[in-house]
Amino acid sequence: MRHHFDRRSLLRGGMAVGLGTLTAGGMSAEAAATSSLRARLQADIDAYLARRRRAEGITAISAYVSRFADDPGISVVTGATNRSGRTPIHDRTLFEIGSNTKAFTSALLLKLEAAGRLHIDQTVGDWLPEYPAWAKVRIRNLLNMTSGIPTYSEAPRFMRAQAANKYRHFTPEQLIAYAYPAPGNHLPTSRGYFYSNTNYILAGLIVAKAGGVSYDQQVRQRIFKPLRMRDSFYDSWKLPEDVIERMTSGYFLNPACSEYRPDCTIGPLAPLDGQDMRRADVSWTGAAGGIVSTPRDLARWVRGIFGGAVVPPAQLAQMKQLVSTKTGKPISHVTPDDPGGFGLGLAQAYHPRLGRIWFYEGVTLGYRGVFAWLPHDDLVLAVALNSQPPDGQDQIGALMEELYITVAG
């Protein structure tokens, strides 16, 4: 049986009893409890960095905990911006958050739907007739990964081009071309659920076409600004220098084979092994993964989307409609036997200890950004690390569980 923690009553109730009560040092009981929790969270990430620095190639961890909707939150950081160790990170140091961007893209489309500009059961053919091979694919199928469209990011040709020049700029159309069926370019299609970044590059083009202005402008004006996400950035061309300067270095350590050629001898990204990817061009991720942010802002986004501050209730309900990542069929929720569900840019998982949680890990060539929202506890955890580790070495899920245990007491 899952051990249930009622986060609202546990934390708010405890605070209500302690308000106005001072410790011997003059600190309120509430402040003392928060200070103690911060120290324990700090110890968690310090220990993780010490334990996993070599295996994962990380030099920095940033974490943020939001214990209820109006909680000011707790930020903890550890480590340095690069391998030299000379410059410590702080709570506004920036990380790429990768595929967490997908939920922003879905939200923009659903905001456009709510405004009557499109419907997510329209098709690629309705909006992007230049891709007739995918004309019958619905926008909904793009967003919940049931389109059958291959992912450009695992195409060996694309990976070789990326490895040859990490500063190369890719347009959305160029990315799509790596996956689009053409003479000499036939990646396998899929049935059911298949995670494809191409889906969200197409979705980003539809956002721009239906919205009448660029994806960049829409994500800034319709999401970052109203949610006061002041440490979040997206640029389809090139990140501004002042944003890059605020980023920690990010290290690539995973020269694995392509998903489409799993039996390779040398992975196509091997030339990038060990490199710092901070200044690498992020256009290759686009509307599928191009946002740069902080754990605090990521948690603010999670509160906003699940709290109903981003899209109307009808559209939020659509975002949360799941398909099984095992079968591709609709499910109402995840279970121990069917533990993974994907909505419209959002994912639900079943955890043996934590039960049903909304959880997403975004990974780029040098960064990881992850959140967990536990509705039963009204708790949001967000963490960022500065590497893509070797296959089998990503233990960020264990870190999230440690942080949860610390908060829950």
Indicate residue ranges for each PLM-predicted region.
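Flexible, Gly/Pro-enriched loop and linker segments at secondary-structure and domain junctions
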Residues: S62, Y367-R368
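Short, surface-exposed loop or secondary-structure junction motifs
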Residues: D71-G73, K136-I357
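Short, conserved catalytic-motif segment at the N-terminal edge
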Residues: R38-F95, H119
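C-terminal region of N-terminal signal peptides and the immediate post-cleavage residues
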Residues: L22-S36
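Short active-site loop at a secondary-structure junction
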Residues: A55-T59, G85-L142, H186-T198, G286, ...
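Short, well-ordered beta-strand elements
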Residues: Y360, R368-S387
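Short, gly/Ser/Thr-rich active-site loops of penicillin-recognizing serine hydrolases
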Residues: L322-I331, Q388-G409
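N-terminal secretory signal peptides and thylakoid transit peptides that target proteins
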Residues: M1-G18
